[in-house]
Design a protein with these regions (language model features):
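N-terminal beta1-alpha1-beta2 module of alpha/beta enzyme domains
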Residues: 1-57, 63, 158
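Residue-level signal for the nucleotide or nucleotide-sugar donor/cofactor binding architecture
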Residues: 10, 64-68, 107
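Generic domain-boundary/flexible-linker signal
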Residues: 14, 41, 66, 96-98, ...
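Generic recognition of short, well-ordered alpha-helical segments
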Residues: 17, 41, 68-72, 175
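Acidic, glycine-rich active-site loops and adjacent beta-strand->loop/helix elements
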Residues: 36-37, 59-68, 91-95
Length: 177
């Protein structure tokens, strides 16, 4: 059994010591959440202060960000952590998507499936040199020029988990995670 704990996010200057303490205490990982604070930046800081623990978003709100932007952030975190990053995503509810993030609402299961498929196509483009050609109903990624391709990191693909509430999202988790 793996045991993860929450990484305090309220003060980035405290993150190195907090992350090191989590690692020294024997935890298997540290998780950030998208509540009051952005979930990715503390993990970047923690990656520089740790060597062993898994670093994970638990969860980041997907639809508020482009899959291309999240793919890039996740790739950078995977590189900085030397393969210890896990991307946890969630769809959030309709009201938050529309009124808090000002993004259009659509059924979350097919949209999150495409979101993850699109990111994986982007990562394959970057890491394996595949032509980027992902076309779905919600997301289309067909342009990638050399100037925007990060250096290959030679690490395993970023693991993706999702917050699943309800039978349809649970089935999706079983298929894509």
């Amino acid at each position: 059994m793996r045991v993860l704990t929450v990484l305090p996010q309220h003060n980035l200057q405290d993150v190195p010591a907090e992350a090191a303490a989590i690692e020294a205490a024997g935890y298997d990982g540290a998780v950030t959440m998208e509540n009051k604070y952005e979930p990715f930046l503390p993990l970047a800081v923690a990656a520089t202060a740790t060597d062993r623990i898994e670093l994970s978003t638990g969860i980041a709100i997907a639809f508020a960000r482009s899959p291309m932007v999240v793919a890039e952030t996740a790739h950078d975190l995977q590189t900085a952590s030397k393969g210890r990053f896990t991307l946890g995503l969630g769809s959030q509810v309709k009201g938050h998507n529309e009124r808090r993030f000002s993004v259009p609402w659509s059924p979350p299961v097919p949209r999150l499936r495409e979101y993850i498929e699109g990111m994986r196509a982007i990562w394959r483009c970057w890491e394996k040199g595949e032509k980027l050609n992902y076309v779905g109903e919600h997301y289309q990624f067909t342009l990638m020029t050399p100037n925007f391709i990060p250096d290959r990191n030679g690490l395993p693909p970023v693991p993706v988990t999702i917050a699943a509430v309800g039978p349809a999202m649970l089935r999706l988790a079983g298929r894509v995670c």
